[in-house]
Amino acid sequence: MDGSRRVRATSVLPRYGPPCLFKGHLSTKSNAFCTDSSSLRLSTLQLVKNHMAVHYNKILSAKAAVDCSVPVSVSTSIKYADQQRREKLKKELAQCEKEFKLTKTAMRANYKNNSKSLFNTLQKPSGEPQIEDDMLKEEMNGFSSFARSLVPSSERLHLSLHKSSKVITNGPEKNSSSSPSSVDYAASGPRKLSSGALYGRRPRSTFPNSHRFQLVISKAPSGDLLDKHSELFSNKQLPFTPRTLKTEAKSFLSQYRYYTPAKRKKDFTDQRIEAETQTELSFKSELGTAETKNMTDSEMNIKQASNCVTYDAKEKIAPLPLEGHDSTWDEIKDDALQHSSPRAMCQYSLKPPSTRKIYSDEEELLYLSFIEDVTDEILKLGLFSNRFLERLFERHIKQNKHLEEEKMRHLLHVLKVDLGCTSEENSVKQNDVDMLNVFDFEKAGNSEPNELKNESEVTIQQERQQYQKALDMLLSAPKDENEIFPSPTEFFMPIYKSKHSEGVIIQQVNDETNLETSTLDENHPSISDSLTDRETSVNVIEGDSDPEKVEISNGLCGLNTSPSQSVQFSSVKGDNNHDMELSTLKIMEMSIEDCPLDV
């Protein structure tokens, strides 16, 4: 029993002290266990010792209810590892700085001793060779320069890491010696054994851990990419701007409501792919404008020429033959004039293709709102006249100066035709003029290199246009057998009068003179007056019918009057069933456009 207990007691030894010391609380002589003489036995002492050892071992191995150990995330964190590495590097640099201080003090002491020995060697007789003295001087100069480079400041150490590493690594290669003295005092010239032995007396402990210090210098000072690869980053102060890869993948963030994608330069080929991830409202309009801008001028001309068609009241739609490139301009224009009818429509604007603007959806909405405001105001007032409409249109045009005046006037003209304030013949004639002007603009756009050659053609086209316009006006008026047809340079503008009218009063209004009236009767066949002002208004007032006003202005009709020009009025009387008076205005060498009649 005692043997087994003794073996067990020796196997379980206390961790807090040596096994054979029974002093203090381990002794049973001075505590409550010492009751009788049996407690003085060795077995009893060992038993108490074992119980106490187990008790204290349990206390020492007890764990806290709260886990205070280092979390796993800290050990796996890259940031924490970088911080620990930086702290370790700082400690190593501080230790290296202390070592440099020690080496500096040791080198100063050696420098004093070496300077004394050098002074003694320089006092030798002149018969000895001077090569050894020169070598000693060179070695001393190298030693002093190396001592100056060893500055204990951390900044100087941090900046000169690469240079010192070069010195340390290149030293053993040149001298093929493992001693630190040969590394420190590497000279350019040949070395003698005496000088090597002189400087090699320094103990090895003055420059410890040279290999470890070399590895520390070769490491980066921090784990930051901006510090490791600073040459790849031009300006670190600029803010970070994210970039998107040019891929067809759809971003998951585009499904969110308040997500705005990164902007980048859009190519025409990539715009259709980016349409799924694009959230801007103006994407469709930008795509449409980009497509139209890429089209060439020839494609635009062919596409727009195919849209220009002529409509007849009893004939079907016939497109203009502008698709062939071999046909000349005169043939196209003559053919267009032959096919033109009173209801000819043209879907062009009056601008050439090079300067014609492409309106986006937003601009079209602005023009639609402009027309909507005008129509709403007309409907609110109810009653209106031509003068009132003109004032209303001018006021709205002045209020919308950010829009183009030509397009607004075109829309107002269409609205006026729809309201019935302008006859359809005038609108059709205006469209004919628009079609001819478009042809002229297209010709001007295609004939820019041949400007000198086309000057004569422009005058011929103007004369041809005047002649065709005069023919259209004569065909629209009633004819008589005694009517004289005009020449290509002069034509007559007829004014129709009913048979029930008794007389016509013609008033000539000038800006500087008073009003002059003259009465035309059947007994007076013609009256000639000279025009002294540029703007002339002729008021034709019939006796029985409503008043009609014909205004011929310089801005609308293109009249450039002079004192030499004359106006002739003539009256023609026919049979009893066709009694009429025909007043013709003879205009010499002037371009005429359509003049609207206000009913």
Curated annotation (Swiss-Prot):
Residues 163-205 are annotated as: Disordered. Keywords: Cell projection, Cytoplasm, Cytoskeleton, Leber congenital amaurosis, Retinitis pigmentosa, Sensory transduction, Vision. GO terms for biological process: microtubule cytoskeleton organization; photoreceptor cell maintenance; protein localization to photoreceptor connecting cilium; protein localization to photoreceptor outer segment; visual perception. Involved in the maintenance of both rod and cone photoreceptor cells. It is required for recruitment and proper localization of RPGRIP1 to the photoreceptor connecting cilium (CC), as well as photoreceptor-specific localization of proximal CC proteins at the distal CC. Maintenance of protein localization at the photoreceptor-specific distal CC is essential for normal microtubule stability and to prevent photoreceptor degeneration. Found in a complex with CFAP410, NEK1 and SPATA7. Interacts with NEK1. Interacts with RPGRIP1. Interacts with RPGR. Interacts with NPHP4. Interacts with NPHP1. Interacts with AHI1. Signal peptide: none annotated. Its main location: cytoplasm. This is Spermatogenesis-associated protein 7. It comes from the Eukaryota. Changing I332T: Found in a patient with LCA3. Residues 166-175 have a biased composition (Polar residues). One of its GO terms (cellular component) is microtubule cytoskeleton. It is linked to Leber congenital amaurosis 3: A severe dystrophy of the retina, typically becoming evident in the first years of life. Visual function is usually poor and often accompanied by nystagmus, sluggish or near-absent pupillary responses, photophobia, high hyperopia and keratoconus. It is found in: Cytoplasm, Cytoskeleton, Cilium axoneme; Cytoplasm, Cytoskeleton, Cilium basal body; Cytoplasm, Cytoskeleton; Cell projection, Cilium, Photoreceptor outer segment.
